[in-house]
Amino acid sequence: MTTAVLEALFAELRFDADGLVPAIAQQHDTGEVLMLAWMNRESIKETLAGGRVVYWSRSRRALWRKGDTSGQIQHLKELRLDCDGDALLLLVDQVGVACHTGRRNCFYRAVRDGTLAVIADVEVPAEELYGKG
């Protein structure tokens, strides 16, 4: 990725006051929405340079290399920006589960029939992902 392409991308993006933009991760071959996270210029550069998705952790205030702890990494297939430049869509190849709860994706709760229902089972217990428990 050339500096000119990065500069053009950053010129089109509208980062918030903290220098962040929301990024939706979607499984490239099935269309499954996996998660929402945040990216800054540094995480975008690293993701595009290496092909492995890197986010910005708002709680840790540091780069978050998805899967460093759990092994559940995301390989970038394509990065897209929306019409307003205020959100990214990352088409990824998810290795394992995307959610820290051990579910395939982070959208495992739904309002159905007037109740909040869990619609996806845990695939990998959190203690296996993170060695806690």
UniProtKB/Swiss-Prot annotation:
EC number: 3.5.4.19
PANTHER family from the UniProt entry: HISTIDINE BIOSYNTHESIS BIFUNCTIONAL PROTEIN (PTHR42945), HISTIDINE BIOSYNTHESIS BIFUNCTIONAL PROTEIN HIS7 (PTHR42945:SF1)
Source taxon at top rank: Bacteria
Catalytic activity as recorded in UniProt: 1-(5-phospho-beta-D-ribosyl)-5'-AMP + H2O = 1-(5-phospho-beta-D-ribosyl)-5-[(5-phospho-beta-D-ribosylamino)methylideneamino]imidazole-4-carboxamide
Organism of origin: Rhodospirillum centenum (strain ATCC 51521 / SW)
Pathway given in the UniProt record: Amino-acid biosynthesis; L-histidine biosynthesis; L-histidine from 5-phospho-alpha-D-ribose 1-diphosphate: step 3/9
Gene3D superfamilies, alphabetized: 4.10.80.70, Phosphoribosyl-AMP cyclohydrolase
Protein name, per record: Phosphoribosyl-AMP cyclohydrolase
Gene this protein is translated from: hisI
Similarity-based family: Belongs to the PRA-CH family.
